[in-house]
Structures are given as C-alpha cells and as structure tokens.
C-alpha cells in the first residue's frame, strides 16, 4: 500500500496568510478477482481518503464483469489558494477501471497573497490491466495560480486512455484569463522509462500566450492520450476519417503514445471531440465499445 507522508499540523487548516494550506488525498486500488463468474470481476479493494476528496461506490454499467466505473468527488467543487489535492489510483493485473468526475472542476482566483493551489494525480497500471482517466473539463478563473501534475506509470502490457480539457477564463461573461499563472506537468513512463514528458506554463503576461507560435490566444485546450493500441497508425487513420474536419485539432504518435491535441475557443467542442475520439479508440484499446458514464448525462 502506498503510504502518504504525514501532514504537518500547520499544513492543513484555517489559515489566511502565505502559509495557508488545505490538504486532501485519495488512494484507490483495483483488483481483478475470480468470483462466481467465468470472467474476473474488477473490484475496488482499497479506498483511503483524507479531507474532502472521496468516492461513494463503484458502478458496473457495462455488466458485472465489465469495467468498474468510479466517480471522484470533491465536494467544494474547485480549488482555491492553499488547496493541495493528491489522487492515487492503482489497477492490478487484469483489472479494468474508469475514473471520471461528476462536474467541471474550477480553479478560482488566488488570494491577496498570491498563494497557489496544487493538484497531483498518480496512476499506476499493471500488466494486462486497463485504466481510463476521463475527468470532466477544468475551468481556470482569471487570477488563478497553481500547479497540476499527472504521472502515469505503466507496466509492460498495460493499457491506458485519458484526457485533460482546460478552459481559460470565462469569455462568455467577458472575464478572460488575463492574470495568474498555471503550470501543467505530464509524466508517462513504461517500466520506469519515460515515454512522454511535458511541461507547460500558461502565463497570460508572456508573449507566448498570445503569440501564433504558442497559445495563439486560444482559450480552450485539450490533450488525449492512449497507450496499448495494437495498430496506432490504423487508429490515427480512423480518427482522421471520422472526427470533424477542421484545423483546431491534430493527432500523432510517438514512442507508443497516441496523442490528440485540441486548441481553440469552444469548451463544448473540445469535450465533444475527446468524447468522440474515445468512442472510436476504446474498442481498439479494450475490445469493448464505449459506455458513456451516467454522470455525464445529468
């Protein structure tokens, strides 16, 4: 079992200075178990939480022996200065889990001290296991400051598909992302060897943010990844043939990782693109059709 470091007594609580912290952590473990069915059943066998971050119960909308769906719940609904969220999930050999969230996450404006928030996600997938990480979109309010890290550790034979959809500011309310700074880090490895490393700093004051060689003034971006496809080239051909034909997205593959990117101005368009890509890729990755989580329909 992964052990969390002890939280200092001043690291979490009601403080309103530069040392303010409010920590929350969630640790999940999934295993494929041979029960009465001839096909193993993926069970949520470990669930530890600290603070306002938890799950209620697993769902099996694809049948008892199908993928185990779990909703990650953060009742506050967003991150403010000093919040520190840590999510860890492990899928053991032969298991199949899907993680999602019930609503869009919100990154609120930093306090007067400029204290940042942090969100750190670590996903571990064993041999012949599958993990789908499909959170709903994240909305960064003007003035938000924080660090988001996503670490995915795969064993040989593991498969994974996931995405991150980020909307900057609230342009419909004439509230653009004009101040603040967000940093995103991705680290995906296979047997300890890096396959995809990426660091992105989103600072509206930097010329890269509006430059055509950078963000180009786009307010919405998305990244979808997939590892474990038998034929990546064929998968790319399917995406190019069936996804909407416009210049706001592109797809490529590198070192066994399929990457689809979106850069535009429409949050719903980015989400729809990722969801449609998932519907196309899932049968190729997991040999089962996509089954939309019920929470997305509410």
Swiss-Prot record:
Its main location: cytoplasm. It is found in: Cytoplasm. InterPro entries: UreD. Keywords: Chaperone, Cytoplasm, Nickel insertion. GO terms for cellular component: cytoplasm. GO terms for molecular function: nickel cation binding. It comes from the Bacteria. Pfam families: UreD. Belongs to the UreD family. HAMAP family: UreD (MF_01384). Required for maturation of urease via the functional incorporation of the urease nickel metallocenter. UreD, UreF and UreG form a complex that acts as a GTP-hydrolysis-dependent molecular chaperone, activating the urease apoprotein by helping to assemble the nickel containing metallocenter of UreC. The UreE protein probably delivers the nickel. This is Urease accessory protein UreD. It comes from Marinobacter nauticus (strain ATCC 700491 / DSM 11845 / VT8) (Marinobacter aquaeolei). The lineage of its organism: Bacteria, Pseudomonadati, Pseudomonadota, Gammaproteobacteria, Pseudomonadales. The gene is ureD.
């Amino acid at each position: 079992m992964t052990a969390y470091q002890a939280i200092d007594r001043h690291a979490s609580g009601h403080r309103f200075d530069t040392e303010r912290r409010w920590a929350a952590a969630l640790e999940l473990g999934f295993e494929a178990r041979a029960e009465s069915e001839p096909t193993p059943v993926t069970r949520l066998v470990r669930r530890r939480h600290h603070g306002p971050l938890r799950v209620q119960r697993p769902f099996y909308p694809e049948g008892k022996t199908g993928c185990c769906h779990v909703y990650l719940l953060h009742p506050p609904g967003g991150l403010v200065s000093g919040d520190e969220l840590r999510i860890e999930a492990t899928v053991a050999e032969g298991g199949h889990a899907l993680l999602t969230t019930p609503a869009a996450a919100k990154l609120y404006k930093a306090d007067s001290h400029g204290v940042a928030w942090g969100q750190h996600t670590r996903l571990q997938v064993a041999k012949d296991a599958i993990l789908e990480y499909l959170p709903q979109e994240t909305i960064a309010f003007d003035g938000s400051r924080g660090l988001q890290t996503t670490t995915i550790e795969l064993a040989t034979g593991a498969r994974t598909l996931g995405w991150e959809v980020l909307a900057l500011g609230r342009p419909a309310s004439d509230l653009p992302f004009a101040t603040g700074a967000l940093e995103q880090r991705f680290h995906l490895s296979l047997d300890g060897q890096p396959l995809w490393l990426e660091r992105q700093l989103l600072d509206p004051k930097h010329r890269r943010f509006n430059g055509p060689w950078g963000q180009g003034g786009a307010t919405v971006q998305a990244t979808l990844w997939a590892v474990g496809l038998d034929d990546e080239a064929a998968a790319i051909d399917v995406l190019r043939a069936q996804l909407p034909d416009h210049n706001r997205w592109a797809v490529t593959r590198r070192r066994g990782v399929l990457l689809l990117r979106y850069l535009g101005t429409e949050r719903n368009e980015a989400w729809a693109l990722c969801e449609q890509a998932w519907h196309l890729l899932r049968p190729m990755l997991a040999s089962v059709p996509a089954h939309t989580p019920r929470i997305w329909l509410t």
